């Protein structure tokens, strides 16, 4: 799943740790780790929150485009 790598790359590009993103999403670090590794499916509400936070489109995170354009 390509989006798993995108989640990790976006987080690491901002020098953030999993615990930082977990806090943003209102979840725990172990739970967020499961999203990044594909053990658990990322809820749509979290996908939208992450797209807004990283200022990219949900399509970019999902690997449907390489265009990061963000439209609030």
What are these regions (language model features)?
Residues 7, 21-22, 32-35, 61:
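Conserved hydrophobic/aromatic packing and binding residues within compact polymer-binding modules
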Residues 26, 45-60:
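DNA major-groove recognition helix of helix-turn-helix/homeodomain DNA-binding modules
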Residues 36, 54, 65:
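DNA major-groove recognition helix of helix-turn-helix
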